[in-house]
Amino acid sequence: MTARASQDSAALPLDKETLLTVYRKMRTIRDFEERLHVDFGRGDIPGFVHLYAGEEAAGVGILHHLNDGDRIASTHRGHGHCIAKGVDPVAMMKEIYGKKGGSCNGKGGSMHIADLSKGMMGANGILGAGAPLICGAALAAKFRGKGEVGITFCGDGASNQGTFLESLNLAAVWNLPVIFVIENNGYAESTSRDYGTAVDSYVDRAAGFGIPGVTVDGTDFFAVHEAAGEVIRRAREGGGPSLLECKMVRFYGHFEGDAQTYRAAGELDDIRANKDCLKLFGRAVTQAGVVAREELDTIDREVAALIEHAVQEAKAAPQPGPEDLLTDVYVSY
């Protein structure tokens, strides 16, 4: 296992334009999730919702390296991955509201957003189910020979699923261009890591499959971006799979409505005060003198307007009708 420490923000590795793009992505995810928290609480949104707020640095830090030809498989907590991969937030909002014009025409909902045109193979309500899917996508990419990669995300709990471990072995044996990302927020629903696994770090398992593994501070965008860049480059060059663990925090419960009685007193207050990846990123780029606070404030206002527009579009969109019942049932591609 290789542990990677947080990077000194005094020497930022990205130019100003890229930093502003990254901030916009992270802010869009945060505001998107915060608005869902409010609207779900009002009863406006059907089904279940699992929010990515607090984890933005990992999704954006990793997926910033990808293009539309690269494939990803997400999780039940997948809104952040979708936005980071380039899926339209308006189409996503319609999907979550269960409306026509959504990314899956309102039939998938929060846990099953997909957009193949962006390489987003889909979020998945089944824990660990993205791993075998991305192995198939990575095998196809290997045959095409264009240097494309696949990335699958899962939580710390899902990494104990048999499908995940079997996929690690398959990817290693076939030398597939795939990166397995464990987003370790410390809880498998309400079960802490200590109750779910005996290893000190999830990447300790990588050696057993003959692949490299790296652990990073998932609240530090720059640490995630650097580590992800290395394993993605390795995969593009034919070096095979890697395991990347991002130690991170989530601002809300496992699902909306989770009472979070498993958390220690004051834990959430500490997380929001000291481990907010968006604040940490903003502080790093402004203290380095690369970006002015006013520029970030402008992005904040623009993103707020985008999210409000997305919500209004979703509310105004029609529901799927009886004529839609048998469409999208089968797929052939």
Curated annotation (Swiss-Prot):
Q: Which CDD domains match?
A: TPP_E1_PDC_ADC_BCADC
* Oxidoreductase is among the record's keywords: yes
List the Pfam families.
Answer: E1_dh
Cofactors that this protein relies on: thiamine diphosphate
Pathway(s) per entry: Ketone degradation; acetoin degradation
Give the GO molecular function terms: pyruvate dehydrogenase (acetyl-transferring) activity
**Biological process per Gene Ontology, one example term:** acetoin catabolic process
Which keywords label this protein? Acetoin catabolism, Oxidoreductase, Thiamine pyrophosphate
* EC numbers for this chain: 1.1.1.-
InterPro entries to which the protein is assigned, alphabetical = DH_E1, PDH_E1_Alpha_Subunit, THDP-binding
What does this chain do?
A: Catalyzes the 2,6-dichlorophenolindophenol-dependent cleavage of acetoin into acetate and acetaldehyde, in vitro. The alpha subunit is probably the catalytic subunit of the enzyme.
Q: How does it assemble?
A: Tetramer of 2 alpha and 2 beta subunits.
Protein known as: Acetoin:2,6-dichlorophenolindophenol oxidoreductase subunit alpha
- Source organism: Cupriavidus necator (strain ATCC 17699 / DSM 428 / KCTC 22496 / NCIMB 10442 / H16 / Stanier 337)
